[in-house]
Structure formats: structure tokens, C-alpha cells
Amino acid sequence: EIQNAGLYAILR
């Protein structure tokens, strides 16, 4: 899921 990858980048 590409969208999830973007979300985790912000959470990290």
C-alpha cells in the first residue's frame, strides 16, 4: 500500500 508508506514516513 503506497499510501500507507507515506503515512508511516510522517509518523517516523
Swiss-Prot record:
Q: Which domain of life is it from?
A: Eukaryota
Q: In the Enzyme Commission scheme, what number(s) does this protein have?
A: 3.2.1.23
Q: A Gene Ontology molecular-function term?
A: beta-galactosidase activity
Residues annotated as signal peptide: none
Q: Kindly state which reaction or reactions the protein catalyses.
A: Hydrolysis of terminal non-reducing beta-D-galactose residues in beta-D-galactosides
GO CC annotation: what is one? apoplast
What keywords appear on the UniProt entry? Allergen, Apoplast, Glycosidase, Hydrolase, Secreted
Subcellular location as annotated: Secreted, Extracellular space, Apoplast
What does the similarity note say?
Answer: Belongs to the glycosyl hydrolase 35 family.
The note filed under miscellaneous reads: On the 2D-gel the determined pI of this protein is: 6.23, its MW is: 90 kDa.
Write down what this protein is called: Beta-galactosidase
Species name for this entry?
Phoenix dactylifera (Date palm)
